[in-house]
A protein has these predicted regions:
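Long, low-complexity, intrinsically disordered segments
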Residues: 158-165
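Conserved beta-strand-loop-alpha-helix hinge in the C-terminal portion
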Residues: 133-158
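Short, flexible helix/strand-to-coil boundary loops that buttress conserved ligand/catalytic motifs
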Residues: 123-124, 138
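ABC family nucleotide-binding domain
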Residues: 1-123
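Glycine-rich, phosphate-binding/catalytic loops in enzymes
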Residues: 22, 98, 130, 144-145
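Conserved short hydrophobic beta-strand within the ABC ATPase nucleotide-binding domain
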Residues: 126-128
């Protein structure tokens, strides 16, 4: 399982290469193999020329690509992406989503958590949760998959918090 965090969670005093090596250290991968694997992962996300940079020397989109490289380093079949575009501008969000779509086309399962319906409908399947319960599980392109813009603003029912009985 590879995990992509919303806030990147890069270690500020480690280089990009060292950040991507972290899960490989915990997996007991020998140093030379760890270095080669991390370098290849950074090259895969277009950052092979910034191996020695520190995270604070990068844009938000570049930091998210490092987080993606770290998630890919162990070659997981499943990638869990928690709001991977939440802290990014729209252009960079499209780039990151494109990378995740490419990973899916290459055979990875990508589980993407989002509150953004415009992102969710790009998936093949949507599982929507409300109050911890599954309220929809199906084709992302089915009419019932689309959340109405005002769904969060529904009027409370009589007797619920904020209303008078």
């Amino acid at each position: 399982l590879g995990f992509i965090f919303q806030q990147y969670n890069l270690l500020p005093k480690l280089t990009l290469l060292e950040n991507v090596e972290v899960p490989l250290v915990y997996a007991g991968i020998p140093a030379a193999q760890r270095h080669a694997t991390a370098k290849a992962a950074l090259e895969r996300v277009g950052l092979g020329n910034k191996l020695k940079n520190l995270p604070n020397q990068l844009s938000g989109g570049q930091q998210q690509r490092v987080a993606i490289a770290r998630a890919l380093a162990r070659g997981p079949a499943v990638i869990l992406a928690d709001e991977p575009t939440g802290a990014l501008d729209s252009h960079t969000s499209r780039e990151v989503l494109g990378m995740l779509q490419d990973l899916h086309k290459q055979g990875n399962t990508v589980v993407l958590i989002t509150h953004d319906n415009s992102i969710a409908v790009q998936a093949e399947r949507i599982i929507r949760l409300e109050d911890g319960r599954v309220v929809y599980d199906g084709d992302a392109h089915a009419p019932e998959a689309v959340v109405q813009p005002n769904f969060m603003m529904a009027e409370p029912k009589a007797g619920e918090e904020g209303t008078q009985a």
